[in-house]
Swiss-Prot record:
GO terms for cellular component: mitochondrial inner membrane; respiratory chain complex IV. Its cofactor is Cu cation. This is Cytochrome c oxidase subunit 2. Pfam families: COX2 (PF00116), COX2_TM (PF02790). It is an enzyme of class 7 (translocase). Belongs to the cytochrome c oxidase subunit 2 family. Component of the cytochrome c oxidase (complex IV, CIV), a multisubunit enzyme composed of 14 subunits. The complex is composed of a catalytic core of 3 subunits MT-CO1, MT-CO2 and MT-CO3, encoded in the mitochondrial DNA, and 11 supernumerary subunits COX4I, COX5A, COX5B, COX6A, COX6B, COX6C, COX7A, COX7B, COX7C, COX8 and NDUFA4, which are encoded in the nuclear genome. InterPro entries: CcO_II, CcO_II-like_C, CcO_II_C, Copper_CuA, Cupredoxin, Cyt_c_oxidase_su2, Cyt_c_oxidase_su2_TM_dom, Cyt_c_oxidase_su2_TM_sf. It comes from Rhabdomys pumilio. Binds a dinuclear copper A center per subunit.
Length: 227
């Protein structure tokens, strides 16, 4: 869950988000080291009186500044590719949910159940209850079982949208005429908030997403009550 004046990422709720957080820290460390080295070299150049205006080539230096950046790029690319494969892979999903973006609300369909589908609109500010979040609450939350792989099929009825839940490491474009796939897995129960992350019109800011992750038993009771 985000909080005011937050500088870092939201707490990871899924294995994918944990990997993304580690990759962020890994890349940031490399960027920090490179920036420190460059600033150190610049400070030396500005403070020293020694110059080498007659130097035309330096084979050793050129070799170093060719091989070193290549090695750094490999160190960044390898964990990135690993995470990409993890995000794309889903074997035997326990549940499939189809998500459709509209101007300006979301609709959900549980394809493993008959007639289990609903629309999800933002709750107006004047209807919020104490403790609820402005511009983030919805009238119908999407309820999913925790600790199980869930396949989300995401598309759009009209314009480009993007279904995004930061704490789960999810951001998948909803494109008209195209079906995109995302994997949802939560390590713990709770409410997780997201929003449409693609500018889709005048009410783009009013398309929140609320996932309620619950134990499997509670999900079965909820789905039975909805059918």
């Amino acid at each position: 869950m985000a909080y005011p004046f937050q500088l870092g990422l939201q707490d990871a709720t899924s294995p994918i988000m944990e990997e993304l957080t580690n990759f962020h820290d890994h890349t940031l460390m490399i960027v920090f080291l490179i920036s420190s080295l460059v600033l150190y070299i610049i400070s030396l150049m500005l403070t020293t009186k020694l110059t080498h205006t007659s130097t035309m080539d330096a084979q050793e230096v050129e070799t170093i500044w060719t091989i070193l950046p290549a090695a750094i790029l490999v160190l960044i690319a390898l964990p990135s590719l690993r995470i990409l494969y993890m995000m794309d892979e889903i074997n035997n999903p326990a549940l499939t949910v189809k998500t459709m973006g509209h101007q300006w609300y979301w609709s959900y369909e549980y394809t493993d159940y008959e007639d289990l589908c609903f629309d999800s609109y933002m709750t107006p500010t004047n209807e919020l209850k104490p403790g609820e979040l402005r511009l983030l609450e919805v009238d119908n939350r999407i309820v999913l079982p925790m600790e199980l792989p869930i396949r989300m099929l995401i598309s759009s009825e009209d314009v480009l949208h993007s279904w995004a839940v930061p704490s789960l490491g999810l951001k998948t474009d909803a494109i008209p005429g195209r079906l995109n796939q995302a994997t949802v897995t939560s390590n713990r129960p709770g409410l997780f908030y997201g929003q449409c992350s693609e500018i889709c019109g005048s009410n783009h800011s009013f398309m929140p997403i609320v996932l309620e992750m619950v134990p499997l038993k509670y999900f079965e009771n909820w789905s039975a009550s909805m059918i």
